């Protein structure tokens, strides 16, 4: 412990573990510690079920009907992976995929007028969908063809639109798309949480819809993947990568002090010993005075004994409730997985509802989502602060991750990873940097 490291990492959330893995692959000497006895920090998967009851202070132990406690791995933060998104690229480049097994989520649904509809995933489904009328479908198809052909490097594909200037609102107008289709496109395909994007230049939205379509094209049912045994497997996979490259891991380590001299971090004190470092990466819980609150997220974990109604008995799905449908500013999300993913006892389903808090009564805000899930066997409610670093960390060399937001995918988390990487190294993040070195000696289990 009394050694000199290039980088010390505190907390084993996904952001911290990926950065720890990248730094180790890049030849840095890394020490990675966590005050908890388990991996994952805020983004852990909790097992056995008894631990979840304790964590949420629910009296008594789980009823017999819940099956064996150790058959459960319950994510605290609900997210899926976009099949063609940045996190999957990170997993492929680092070959962390060989520690994990994924399943494709069975469907994505959108809420309209109190009912849920499948987000069409093929042209045939789009034509048969009751989400929009026939003429609307033709216009929508034209729009999707435009998006598919759009290439930032080839102005011939712009068709009179200036991607850096034309707003998305104007693009929708150009294709004569109605309000329902706009809601569905912005929230179920581009995955925006609010409508602020409408008045921004359109290129980002077009790229988001492209990401959705390309992710969908990979596996066909939906654009989302989910790891067997829960999301807690992801940080552990990257932690193994870091360890293979010489990273040192210590769980259950109380952190007594982050030592700063002349405004710059020089080490971390734990159990009376000091480990020195040049740079520090940590989650907000280790540096409460260096972060600020920018909002809150409510998450409700619901245990069900049945699939969600009107989802074709899917054993996994996502439901998006666009804000317009329920008079809100931000969307409500439902992520559902089940025993099919080795995260619940046989015949059980876990549905997690999440959204950005907008009022003094957050539980009331998510009622439309809970109504879709009835009857609910057990609920676990959490309200978490959204925390962001007060500064970039370039002076102190303390680089702090953001807490996980209400989105149901990891794209914003990956943006944060790339951002921290740039602040730490001064260079743009490049996926090639993550390639394992050819002389890698694999820890064969």
Curated annotation (Swiss-Prot):
Q: What is its main location?
A: cytoplasm
Disulfide bonding pattern of the chain: none
Q: What is the tissue localization of expression for this protein?
A: Ubiquitous.
Instruction: Extract the coiled-coil ranges from the record.
Output: none
Q: Kindly list the GO molecular function terms attached to this UniProt entry.
A: GTPase activator activity; Rab GDP-dissociation inhibitor activity; RNA binding; small GTPase binding
Q: Which residues carry this modification: N6-succinyllysine?
A: 57
Q: What GO biological process terms are annotated to this protein in UniProt?
A: negative regulation of cilium assembly; negative regulation of protein localization to cilium; protein transport; signal transduction; small GTPase-mediated signal transduction; vesicle-mediated transport
The membrane topology noted for this protein in its Swiss-Prot or TrEMBL record is: Peripheral membrane protein
**How the protein assembles, per its UniProt entry?**
Interacts with RHOH. Interacts with the GDP-bound inactive forms of RAB3A, RAB3B, RAB3C, RAB5A, RAB5B, RAB5C, RAB8A, RAB8B, RAB10, RAB12, RAB35, and RAB43; binds RAB3D to a lesser extent. Interacts with DZIP1; this interaction negatively regulates the interaction of GDI2 with GDP-bound RAB8A.
Name the family.
Belongs to the Rab GDI family.
Q: Indicate what this protein is called per its UniProt record.
A: Rab GDP dissociation inhibitor beta
């Amino acid at each position: 412990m009394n050694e000199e490291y290039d980088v010390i990492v505190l907390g084993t959330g996904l952001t911290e573990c990926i950065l720890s893995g990248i730094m180790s692959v890049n030849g840095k000497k890394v020490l990675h510690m966590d005050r908890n006895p388990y991996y994952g920090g805020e983004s852990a998967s909790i097992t056995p079920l008894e631990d979840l009851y304790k964590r949420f202070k629910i009296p008594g132990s789980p009823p017999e009907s819940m099956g064996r406690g150790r058959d459960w791995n319950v994510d605290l933060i609900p997210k899926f992976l976009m099949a063609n998104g940045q996190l999957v690229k990170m997993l492929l480049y680092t070959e962390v995929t060989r520690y994990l097994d994924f399943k494709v989520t069975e469907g994505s649904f959108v809420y309209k007028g109190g009912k849920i509809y499948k987000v069409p995933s093929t042209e045939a489904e789009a034509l048969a969908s009751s989400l929009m009328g026939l003429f609307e479908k033709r216009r929508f198809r034209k729009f999707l063809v435009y998006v598919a052909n759009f290439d930032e490097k080839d102005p011939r594909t712009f068709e009179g639109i200036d991607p850096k200037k034309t707003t998305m609102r104007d693009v929708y107008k150009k294709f004569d798309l109605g309000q329902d289709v706009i809601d569905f496109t912005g929230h179920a395909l581009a995955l925006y949480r609010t409508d602020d994007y409408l008045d921004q230049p359109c290129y980002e939205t077009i790229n988001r819809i492209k990401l959705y379509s390309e992710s969908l094209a990979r596996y066909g049912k939906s654009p989302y993947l989910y790891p067997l045994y829960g999301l807690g497997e992801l940080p552990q996979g990257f932690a193994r990568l870091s360890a293979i490259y010489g990273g040192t891991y210590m769980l259950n380590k109380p952190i007594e002090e982050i030592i700063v001299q002349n405004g710059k971090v020089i080490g971390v004190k734990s159990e009376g010993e000091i480990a020195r470092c040049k740079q520090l990466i940590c989650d907000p819980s280790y540096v409460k005075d260096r972060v600020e609150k920018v909002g809150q997220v409510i998450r409700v974990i619901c245990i069900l004994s049945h699939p969600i109604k009107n989802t074709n008995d899917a054993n996994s799905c996502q439901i998006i409730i666009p804000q317009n449908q329920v008079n809100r500013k931000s969307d409500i999300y439902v992520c559902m997985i089940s025993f099919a993913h080795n995260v619940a006892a046989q015949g059980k389903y876990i549905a997690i509802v999440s959204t950005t808090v907008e009022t003094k009564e957050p539980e009331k805000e998510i009622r439309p989502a809970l109504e879709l899930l009835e009857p609910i066997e057990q609920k676990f409610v959490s309200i978490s602060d959204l925390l962001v670093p007060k500064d970039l960390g370039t002076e102190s060399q303390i680089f702090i991750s953001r807490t996980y937001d209400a989105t149901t995918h990891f794209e914003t988390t990956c943006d944060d990873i790339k951002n921290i990487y740039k602040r730490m190294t001064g260079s743009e993040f490049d996926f090639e940097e993550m390639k394992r070195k050819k002389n890698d000696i694999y820890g064969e289990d």
